[in-house]
Amino acid sequence: MTQDRKPPNPARRNQRSRQAILSATADLLGEVGYTKLTVEAIAARAGVGKQTIYRWWPDKGALVLDAYLALVGAEQDLTVPDSGDLEADLRLVLGTTVNSLADPVFEQRYRALLTGIQDDPKLAAALLDRLLKPWLAATKQRLRAAQQAGQIRKVDLDVAAELLYGPVYYRWLLRTGPISREYVDAVVAMTLRALT
């Protein structure tokens, strides 16, 4: 007597392979950095062929960005809270950003990714579109609400959002000093003084 077996679901198998590739990429990015990361090493770690990787991603940069975004859960609806207290809301958001930058898993891989964008304009544009622009847009939406409530002046919201995040990223990227709660509070206070 033979038993009818269902053939494996290719979509499920592909999803398993895809997840293995993303995990291997994130792991290797943290271990060897962007420059030394190869598609061959990713394929070997994930237990797939290079052709499987290239079926889903056109190049290393696209794969690394997808792996990074999957790791940090960055591609979700982003909102900045609106409690009515702009200063508290901005402290919360900037504090969350600082916590992410201080997370060793995040920091190591983000620094590696930023190394990659130096020589890969396509990767730089994708990072901007998929990670930075959505976050800046959410911040600008909160600032726009503050403008409408009369809490801040009519200013260029692109500049205002970058004024908020710029000092933190500068200090983190160049390691010019610690990013403490006091530092975050000072950045928010100075930003609001400039905007009110």
Regions found by a protein language model. Name each.
Residues 77-110:
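Hydrophobic alpha-helical connector segments
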Residues 153, 157-161:
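Membrane-interface starts of transmembrane alpha-helices
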Residues 67-68, 101-126:
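Amphipathic alpha-helical segments used for helix-helix packing
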Residues 56-57, 127, 165, 169-170:
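Tryptophan-centric aromatic hotspots in well-structured domains and transmembrane helices
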Residues 1-45, 51, 56, 62:
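Basic, helix-initiating cap at the start of DNA-binding domains
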Residues 62-71:
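Alpha-helical DNA-contacting segments of helix-turn-helix folds
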Residues 1-8, 88, 92, 133, ...:
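C-terminal peripheral helix-coil segments that are non-catalytic and often amphipathic
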Residues 14, 125-136:
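Amphipathic, non-transmembrane alpha-helical scaffold segments
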